[in-house]
């Protein structure tokens, strides 16, 4: 997997995530992290997940970006 790129534009990140992540919750969580900058702890509390659960969802989001950006 490519390293996360800081130069991804928010608009393009949003478009890729909205197209390739089908779960509404996962899509919202990934966008809250990547576009709005929420921490994994904040996301875990907001979405009633464990820290590890948030990491798993974020792994899917970053993989989608690596494949389709």
Question: Could you say what each language-model-derived stretch is?
Answer:
Residues 42-47:
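Short alpha-helical "recognition helix" segments of helix-turn-helix
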Residues 58-59:
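Conserved tyrosine-mediated DNA breakage-rejoining catalytic core shared by Y-recombinases
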Residues 1-3:
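Charged, low-cysteine interdomain linkers and short loop/connector segments
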Residues 62-69:
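C-terminal flanking helix
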Residues 54-55:
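Helix-turn-helix DNA-binding helix
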Residues 5-25:
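Short, Lys/Arg-enriched anionic-surface-contact patches
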Residues 22-38:
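Short amphipathic alpha helix immediately N-terminal
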């Amino acid at each position: 997997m490519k390293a996360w790129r800081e130069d991804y534009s928010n608009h393009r990140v949003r478009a890729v995530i909205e197209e390739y992540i089908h779960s509404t919750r996962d899509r919202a969580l990934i966008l809250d992290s990547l576009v709005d900058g929420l921490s994994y702890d904040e996301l875990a509390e907001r979405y009633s997940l464990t820290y590890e659960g948030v990491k798993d969802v974020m792994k899917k989001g970053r993989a989608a970006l690596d494949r389709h950006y």
